[in-house]
Swiss-Prot record:
Binding site for RNA: 106, 122, 164
Name recorded for this polypeptide: Nucleoprotein
InterPro entries linked to this entry: N_prot_C_CoV (IPR044344), N_prot_N_CoV (IPR044345), NCAP_bCoV (IPR043505), Nucleocap_CoV (IPR001218), Nucleocapsid_C (IPR037179), Nucleocapsid_N (IPR037195)
Region (Dimerization): 266-384
């Protein structure tokens, strides 16, 4: 009994497609299938991008049951842990979950500046005993092939899986069992996300793959009649970046000039449309913190919406509908304090609102939200208190503690030698005075 991915098990027996008679191929590969090597293998295209014309990648002459995984970061290895890496396919038991990922080196194209750019490769999964390496044993060291199998599968026998007929079977969006660790620097085609999200259910890739497959099967050549290729989106993006003089692989550096331009661009917006960030702080956008603007403190005032804690607070922000229909609104005309006296004065209005955001402890991330709110609500009061406290006098280098304290306390004129109680040697005059003090006192009765 053969199994068909995406369908229930059927009694259809395998028609011997693995021998090469029934496998669908690209039109330009029809002659290669007739050539047989001495070891009985079908002639396979080389897996290097330089094996054909500079603008073409290696050919994938077999249809995979699943959408591909595309590399978007250079230098990242394509690998899975042992027992992982086989996509989920309804109708295929775990004993048949074995096969390999095949690297498809895509074509290169010429950029606007005349240079050739090689697109990063894309990987496709084939069950053991099918695809471009149907004759190879599991675990054979082959460049551009990564073998995967579940723990329940017997890798010594081919998988009993039918080959995909693109005219009747669409490609299945690639998904993996929970707990699968996916290679970094790759994304699953059709999911719009990087490979770490293995639960995508998008069918965009399957429709695109099926449409392209039918076009190739009906037209008899590799060039679709519409002129649209799978790599056209990448080519267009690269051409646009080259035209603008930008490189998508290099991070954009923010200089003082660009930071000033960003800040001015934000400040030119209406007050209710501003989003503070590193280049334009909260105080620059909305002024100092106080009783009427009492949220924000510490790093959040410096980083604004760039603060790592801000996204979880943004989940509490009301929608436009909740703002208008769930708040108390009041329209008031205010004095226009902007502009010169020579300029015509404009009527300025304020739409004042009063509302509330209600949530409970069942909200996801409740503890973190409460922590962030407690740290930032009325934080200006704590900062003002710290500013009002007299700072502790700092001791200068090389100065003793006692000396510093005496200098800070003594602000009057210097003391005399007697007040300072400093010891010194007695002079002859001092000794004479002391003797007179010891003599008995006699009253002078002489008349003046």
């Amino acid at each position: 009994m053969s199994f068909t991915p995406g369908k229930q098990s059927s009694s259809r027996a395998s028609s011997g497609n693995r021998s090469g008679n029934g496998i669908l191929k690209w039109a330009d590969q029809s002659d290669q299938s007739r050539n047989v090597q001495t070891r009985g293998r079908r002639a396979q295209p080389k897996q290097t991008a330089t094996s054909q014309q500079p603008s073409a990648g290696n050919v994938v002459p077999y249809y995979s049951w699943f959408s591909g995984i595309t590399q978007f970061q250079k230098g990242k290895e394509f690998e899975f842990a042992e027992g992982q890496g086989v996509p989920i396919a309804p109708g295929v038991p775990a004993t048949e979950a074995k096969g390999y990922w095949y690297r498809h080196n895509r074509r290169s194209f010429k950029t606007a500046d005349g240079n050739q750019r090689q697109l990063l490769p894309r990987w496709y999964f084939y069950y053991l005993g099918t695809g471009p390496h149907a004759k190879d044993q599991y675990g054979t060291d082959i460049d551009g092939v990564f073998w995967v199998a579940s723990n329940q599968a017997d890798v010594n026998t081919p998988a009993d899986i039918l080959d995909r007929d693109p005219s009747s079977d669409e490609a299945i969006p690639t998904r993996f069992p929970p707990g699968t660790v996916l290679p970094q620097g790759y994304y699953i085609e059709g999911s719009g996300r990087s490979a770490p999200n293995s639960r995508s259910t998008s069918r965009t890739s399957s429709r695109a793959s099926s449409a392209g497959s039918r076009s190739r099967a009906n037209s008899g050549n590799r060039t679709p009649t519409s002129g649209v290729t799978p790599d056209m989106a990448d080519q267009i993006a690269s051409l646009v970046l080259a035209k603008l003089g930008k490189d998508a692989t290099k991070p954009q550096q923010v200089t003082k000039q660009t930071a000033k331009e960003i800040r001015q661009k934000i400040l030119n917006k209406p007050r209710q449309k501003r989003s503070p960030n590193k280049q334009c702080t909260v105080q620059q956008c909305f002024g100092k913190r106080g009783p009427n603007q009492n949220f924000g403190g510490g790093e959040m005032l410096k980083l604004g919406t760039s603060d790592p804690q801000f996204p979880i607070l943004a989940e509490l922000a009301p929608t436009a509908g909740a703002f208008f229909f769930g708040s108390r609104l009041e329209l008031a005309k205010v004095q226009n304090l902007s502009g010169n006296l020579d300029e015509p004065q404009k009527d300025v209005y304020e739409l004042r609102y009063n509302g509330a955001i209600r949530f409970d402890s069942t909200l996801s991330g409740f503890e973190t939200i409460m922590k962030v709110l407690n740290e930032n609500l009325n934080a200006y009061q704590q900062q003002d208190g710290m500013m009002n406290m007299s700072p502790k006098p700092q001791r200068q280098r090389g100065q003793k503690n006692g000396q510093g304290e005496n200098d800070n306390i003594s602000v009057a004129a210097p003391k005399s030698r007697v007040q300072q109680n400093k010891s010194r040697e007695l002079t002859a005059e001092d000794i004479s005075l002391l003797k007179k003090m010891d003599e008995p006192f006699t009253e002078d009765t002489s008349e003046i």
